[in-house]
């Protein structure tokens, strides 16, 4: 059924909501989990152009991903992670093709009013532009 599930990680409490669902799904299908967090601060968005070093925030994001991976591997799951840089929707969409993902799992949030109306949400962009199923769970 599924071989590789991309799990969008926010470094927030919402991560536990989405992970609770996808870990069970991964066990049932034997799928690998690909944990992806997209750092989107100034340093991350201009990392390559300005030849910057990882910011403290990016280092903390990487440590968070490593901790999640360690915990999930201890539960018997196959897990990889990637800390991407830039626009979250663009990077998640790119990674679906680049990493042969066959399911995207991500949490959604309540509306941020003007920002969502003007730019749309990351979840909306991803679900409309990828060619694989997308599992959306509301943050609890």
Roles of regions detected by a PLM:
Residues 106-128:
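Glycine-rich, Arg-bearing micro-motifs that act as flexible, cationic patches
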Residues 51-54, 98-99, 122-123:
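Short, hinge-like loop/turn segments at secondary-structure boundaries
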Residues 52-63:
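A short acidic, glycine-rich active-site loop
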């Amino acid at each position: 059924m599924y071989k590789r599930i991309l799990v969008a990680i926010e470094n927030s409490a919402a991560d536990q909501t989405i992970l609770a669902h996808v870990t069970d799904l991964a066990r049932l299908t034997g799928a690998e989990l690909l944990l992806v967090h997209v750092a989107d601060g100034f340093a991350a968005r201009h990392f390559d152009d300005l030849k910057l070093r990882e910011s403290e925030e990016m280092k903390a994001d990487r440590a968070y991903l490593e901790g999640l991976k360690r915990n999930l591997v201890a539960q018997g799951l196959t897990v990889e992670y990637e800390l991407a840089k830039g626009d979250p929707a663009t990077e998640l969409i790119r990674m679906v093709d680049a990493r042969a993902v066959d399911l995207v799992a991500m949490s959604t949030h309540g509306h941020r009013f003007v920002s969502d109306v003007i730019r749309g949400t990351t979840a909306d962009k991803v679900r409309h532009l990828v060619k694989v199923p997308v599992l959306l769970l509301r943050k609890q």
